[in-house]
């Protein structure tokens, strides 16, 4: 597991109040991890803070799974 992947999974677990072991790459935030719309907004903000990036709304809407978040962080990190 890469450093970025580990950091993303830790943020997701903390933001959604789930065990890190539940945060696997294929999990969807809403369907699998119980996130609501506010959770997803807070999650995007936490990712922005952690990686020093700004995620436009149109991109944020596409980040719906753990793997989406990892890929986005890998591609856009500061």
From Swiss-Prot:
Domain Carrier: 2-77
GO biological process, one term: lipid A biosynthetic process
Residue list for modification O-(pantetheine 4'-phosphoryl)serine: 37
GO CC terms in record: cytosol; membrane
Keyword match Transmembrane helix: no
SUPFAM superfamilies: ACP-like
PROSITE patterns in the cross-refs: CARRIER (PS50075), PHOSPHOPANTETHEINE (PS00012)
Function description: Carrier of the growing fatty acid chain in fatty acid biosynthesis.
Record keywords, A-Z: Cytoplasm, Fatty acid biosynthesis, Fatty acid metabolism, Lipid biosynthesis, Lipid metabolism, Phosphopantetheine, Phosphoprotein
Family: Belongs to the acyl carrier protein (ACP) family.
Organism: Comamonas testosteroni
Top-rank taxon, per record: Bacteria
SMART domains: PKS_PP
GO-annotated molecular function: acyl binding; acyl carrier activity; phosphopantetheine binding
Pathway the protein contributes to: Lipid metabolism; fatty acid biosynthesis
Gene from which this protein is expressed: acpP
Keyword DNA-binding applies: no
Protein name (record): Acyl carrier protein
